Amino acid sequence: MSSQIKQVFARQILDSRGNPTVEVDVVLESGAFGRAAVPSGASTGIREALELRDGNKALFLGKSVYKAVENVNTKIAQAVKGLDALDQRLIDKTMIELDGSENKKNLGANAILGVSLATARAAASHLRKPFYRYLMDVKEYLMPVPMMNVINGGSHADNNVDMQEFMIVPAGFDTFSEALRCGTEVFHTLKKVLIADGYSVAGVGDEGGYAPDLPSNEAAIEAILKAVKEAGYEPGKHVFIALDPASSEFYKDGKYELKSENKSLTSEEMIDYYAAWVEKYPIVSIEDGLAEEDWAGWKLLTEKLGNKVQLVGDDLFVTNPSILAKGIEKGIANSILIKLNQIGTLTETFEAMAMAGQAGYTCVVSHRSGETSDTIIADLAVATCSGQIKTGSLSRSDRIAKYNQLLRIEEELGENAIYPGIKAFVFNSDEEVEEDVQEIIVEDSEAEKVVVQVEE
């Protein structure tokens, strides 16, 4: 039976914050079916592809997405009907040209992405392949090391912590399932630690982490390391720390305003702030350590810490190949966060990952703070052998769904599932890359060859 697209249908559903989002169904002539739901961010980069919302305050406080749904059911459906779902590049190119804008503002990135992902899922169903294997069919796969957001602050929580995410990284294990067990034990122990220290943990933030009112940002790290030890693990051996300050959120008039500590820091002072932490704590990754428009500061940050920790660009690069290319040229950061809805198609996502891999940058596949039960990023992380994933804490079913999908994939792959551990964190330095680092060249229907560096 044919793999041509027969039907495309979108609807409005709710995300994990109770806000409307887009869900798309795609049916092929063969009867194969694919469905995808689009996530949404809270702290968003100024150069992200546009998420189209209606703005009518009488409907969902202005957050409804009926126009995006209508765009899928009319303009996009008419344009892609009859196209071969196995030709992902053609599908995405057709929608990009139909939109005609640089940031997908006409049709909406949420409309375009929903169709892009649902089509890929339908194609995988048509070929009767697991989605990760449809994206990349090889013998061995890297399971991603999870960055688990156990203390939430900033835009993700209602507390006085400036920085957005304090994450545990269980990299000192041989399998993903062992790492996940460690993460859950540390997470539950952290609750006991916070309560014993007199903090309220009655609720959790958008990504499932605790959101206590701590006296300083550093207090979050201290609490986490205490929980790691009380759970029976060793910091720097079994569990490491990753940070996402989301510093664009507290960058005002050229200064970094840490209100919880009553500090106003220049770029150089903010870099020194991080450098002191890197010397003191087992930190392996800092995401958006400086503001997205502070490129001069980013250059200094990379020069000072780029050979010591992973420096991830999220708001900095917004999964955009053209912006990433500029960052690579200027020697800024050494890693990119991959968020599907920042760029709006599967093809462009693969292009960004390919470019990053070729430049020696790592890729961290990521969720958004407004998530759904869709598990597509779990498959994406495995398929691309990115080696790292951010999908929240160890609570809230929208986060756990991704972890459970990774457990299923690891079980299915058996001995062909490789957990890279600390080797997933490759920093740009003057040292030669070890000879056992190999390049896996991935040829798929979504994009050009994807190059991913893998250490075994």
UniProtKB/Swiss-Prot annotation:
**InterPro entries from the xrefs?**
Enolase (IPR000941), Enolase-like_C_sf (IPR036849), Enolase-like_N (IPR029017), Enolase_C (IPR020810), Enolase_CS (IPR020809), Enolase_N (IPR020811)
Name the pathway.
Carbohydrate degradation; glycolysis; pyruvate from D-glyceraldehyde 3-phosphate: step 4/5
Provide the taxonomic classification.
Answer: Bacteria, Pseudomonadati, Pseudomonadota, Gammaproteobacteria, Thiotrichales
Q: Which residues bind (2R)-2-phosphoglycerate?
A: Q164, K339, R368, S369, K390
Primary location group: cytoplasm
What SUPFAM superfamilies is this protein classified in? Enolase C-terminal domain-like, Enolase N-terminal domain-like
Q: Needs which cofactor?
A: Mg(2+)
Q: Which residues form the active site?
A: E207 (proton donor), K339 (proton acceptor)
Q: What is this protein called?
A: Enolase
Q: Does the record bear Acetylation in its keywords?
A: no
Q: Which NCBIfam families match?
A: eno
> What's one GO BP annotation on this UniProt entry?
glycolytic process
